[in-house]
């Protein structure tokens, strides 16, 4: 499996791009091909889908886009083409908010997504996807510019706590000064356990 391709985009078509990596051209299906700069060296994050008859690369400008694509693939009834179409037609913040807020009508606007598929997306992904910049925005709103605290909050989210739970801790933890990341994590876990 490939994580990314680092090469020159030599061809841009309506459904795909071609990335030249050391003389080998990789055809990569992407959501928005014209967002890639032609004849420029770029890193394209990829997912390789292998089936009985085919091997296909799906590409993304950012690792977060790839992660959201992979989450969509986990939904029963959503294949790579549908997931790519969803990513092509939306800003990720709106999509993630719709998933986390049970907004079926918002999800039905995507190609080939009916009420059942929309409900399945919500059922399978609610609480499992986060707004890409929500964590960064959360920390920017903090009253301190404390790197150890920021890292601790990110770690708590990585441990599986929701954005809302962690956001509630920010003020309490920011009142504690001169602490290491580990100490903030420990304090955060204690506060989360208290409920």
Curated annotation (Swiss-Prot):
Biological classification of the source: Bacteria, Bacillati, Bacillota, Bacilli, Lactobacillales
Start and end residues of each stretch annotated as Flexible linker: 139-143
Identification of the protein by name: Holliday junction branch migration complex subunit RuvA
BP GO annotations: DNA recombination; DNA repair
Domain of life of the native organism: Bacteria
Single GO molecular function: four-way junction helicase activity
Subcellular locations according to the entry: Cytoplasm
Region described as Domain I: spans on this chain: 1-61
Job of this protein: The RuvA-RuvB-RuvC complex processes Holliday junction (HJ) DNA during genetic recombination and DNA repair, while the RuvA-RuvB complex plays an important role in the rescue of blocked DNA replication forks via replication fork reversal (RFR). RuvA specifically binds to HJ cruciform DNA, conferring on it an open structure. The RuvB hexamer acts as an ATP-dependent pump, pulling dsDNA into and through the RuvAB complex. HJ branch migration allows RuvC to scan DNA until it finds its consensus sequence, where it cleaves and resolves the cruciform DNA.
SMART domains to which the protein is assigned, alphabetical: HhH1 (SM00278)
Keyword DNA-binding carried by entry: yes
Keywords carried by this UniProt record: Cytoplasm, DNA damage, DNA recombination, DNA repair, DNA-binding
């Amino acid at each position: 499996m490939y994580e990314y391709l680092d090469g020159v985009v030599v061809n841009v078509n309506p459904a795909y791009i071609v990335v030249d990596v050391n003389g080998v051209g990789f055809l990569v299906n992407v959501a928005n091909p014209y967002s890639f700069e032609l004849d420029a060296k770029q890193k394209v994050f990829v997912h390789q889908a292998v089936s009985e008859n085919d091997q296909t690369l799906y590409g993304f400008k950012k690792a977060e886009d790839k992660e959201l694509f992979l989450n969509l693939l986990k939904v029963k009834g959503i294949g790579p083409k549908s997931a790519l179409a969803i990513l092509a037609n939306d800003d990720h913040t709106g999509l993630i908010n719709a998933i986390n807020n049970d907004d079926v009508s918002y999800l039905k606007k995507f190609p080939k997504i009916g009420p059942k598929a929309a409900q399945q997306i919500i059922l399978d992904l609610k609480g499992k996807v986060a707004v890409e910049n929500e964590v960064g925005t959360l920390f920017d709103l903090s009253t301190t510019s404390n790197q150890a605290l920021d890292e601790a909050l990110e770690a708590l989210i990585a441990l599986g706590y929701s954005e809302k739970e962690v956001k509630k801790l920010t003020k309490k933890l920011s009142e504690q000064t001169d602490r290491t990341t580990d100490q903030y994590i420990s304090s955060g876990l204690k506060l989360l356990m208290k409920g």
